[in-house]
Swiss-Prot record:
MF terms (GO), sorted A to Z: DNA binding; intramolecular oxidoreductase activity, interconverting aldoses and ketoses; L-ribulose-5-phosphate 3-epimerase activity; zinc ion binding
Keyword Nucleotide-binding listed: no
NCBIfam families cross-referenced by the UniProt entry: hxl6Piso_put, PRK13209.1, PRK13210.1
Lineage: Bacteria, Pseudomonadati, Pseudomonadota, Gammaproteobacteria, Pasteurellales
Protein name, UniProt field: Putative L-ribulose-5-phosphate 3-epimerase SgbU
Pfam families given in the database record: AP_endonuc_2
Keywords (A to Z) from UniProt: Isomerase
GO biological process: DNA repair; L-ascorbic acid metabolic process
Natural source organism: Haemophilus influenzae (strain ATCC 51907 / DSM 11121 / KW20 / Rd)
Any further remark recorded for this protein: Probably part of a sugar metabolic pathway along with SgbH.
Record function comment: Catalyzes the isomerization of L-xylulose-5-phosphate to L-ribulose-5-phosphate.
InterPro entries with a match to the protein in the record: AP_endonuc_2, L-Ru-5P_3-Epase, Sugar_Epim/Isomerase, Xyl_isomerase-like_sf, Xyl_isomerase-like_TIM-brl
Source organism superkingdom: Bacteria
Length: 286
């Protein structure tokens, strides 16, 4: 068994293909798992209403391919956030959470990544933060009962821009089912002290997103996606060296949005090769 598994985000693979094809392509490209996306689009939200036969079909494809789907990126809460002042939207956010946990149980998904936004399209204030806390408490109660882990991603907005900021919520929620899902690109873009941040959260890190970013500065808002590996602000060798020092044993997920590109498979193969090279330089072999 490999020490560290490397997976690929669903949105890096061609979009209009079957799940059986998606799993087979991920395997052919050298990945061990896929992270499923349940985003704010109606198309991907509809997966929460899959029939029993549709769920069984995907489960069989997982077993046949040997490629698992251990995690779900639940970014649908950007459109339907826990912190919304609209009661109907909050009710929808709870419904999405319930259905996401149910789907996870059926498919063997063990970790649901939550977006660290109280609201995204609304203005934040004390009320939205209060509603966000109520939503997280509700979600963790359900997840714990189903033995599904919830992991909050370090985000592209100040609200959850560091593990330090997440740690406040960890203290409030106080549950082993509430963890953190660092995105090394986002963590770096906010000019955090990477060693201090990783050390603070190492005992609650469920998995790690790998991507490059451009930093936030006094004159720039930064860039949080679609930055080619090696061209941004992330010091990957230093990052992997720190994880080796901290004895991190979890998985890595390469996060890319190449599903509509002309040669997405070539891009993800090259990305994986580059990441492995950085790991080898740091002595963190896969």
């Amino acid at each position: 068994m490999k020490k560290h598994k490397i997976g690929i985000y669903e949105k890096a693979l061609p979009k209009n293909i079957t799940w059986q094809e998606r799993l087979s392509l991920a395997k052919a490209c050298g990945f061990e798992f896929i992270e499923m996306s349940i985003d704010e689009s109606n198309d991907r939200l509809s997966r929460l209403n899959w029939t029993k036969s549709e769920r069984i079909a995907l489960h069989q494809s997982i077993i046949q391919s040997g490629i698992t789907i251990p995690s779900m990126c639940l970014s649908a809460h950007r459109r339907f956030p826990f912190g919304s002042k609209d009661k109907k939207i909050r009710q929808k956010s709870f419904e999405i959470m319930e259905k996401a946990i149910d789907l996870s149980v059926n498919l063997g998904i063990r970790t649901i990544q939550l977006a660290g936004y109280d609201v995204y399209y609304e203005k934040q204030d004390e009320e939205t933060i209060k509603y966000f806390q109520e939503g997280i408490e509700f979600a963790v109660t359900l997840a714990a009962s189903a033995q599904v882990t919830l992991a909050v991603e370090i985000m592209d907005t100040p609200f959850m821009s560091s593990i330090s900021r997440w740690k406040k919520w960890d203290t409030i929620i106080n549950s082993p089912w509430f963890t953190v899902y660092p995105d090394i690109g986002n963590l770096s873009a906010w000019n955090n002290n990477i060693e201090e941040e990783l050390t603070l959260g190492i005992d609650k890190i469920s998995a790690i997103h790998l991507k490059d970013t451009y930093p936030v500065t006094e004159t720039s808002k930064g860039q949080f996606r679609d930055v080619p590996f090696g061209q941004g602000c992330v010091d990957f060798v230093h990052f992997f060296s720190l994880l080796k020092k901290l004895n991190y044993r979890g998985a890595f997920l390469i996060e890319m949005w190449t599903e509509k590109n002309e040669e997405p498979l070539l891009e993800i193969i090259q990305a994986r090769k580059w990441i492995v090279q950085q790991m080898e330089k740091a002595g963190l072999l896969c």
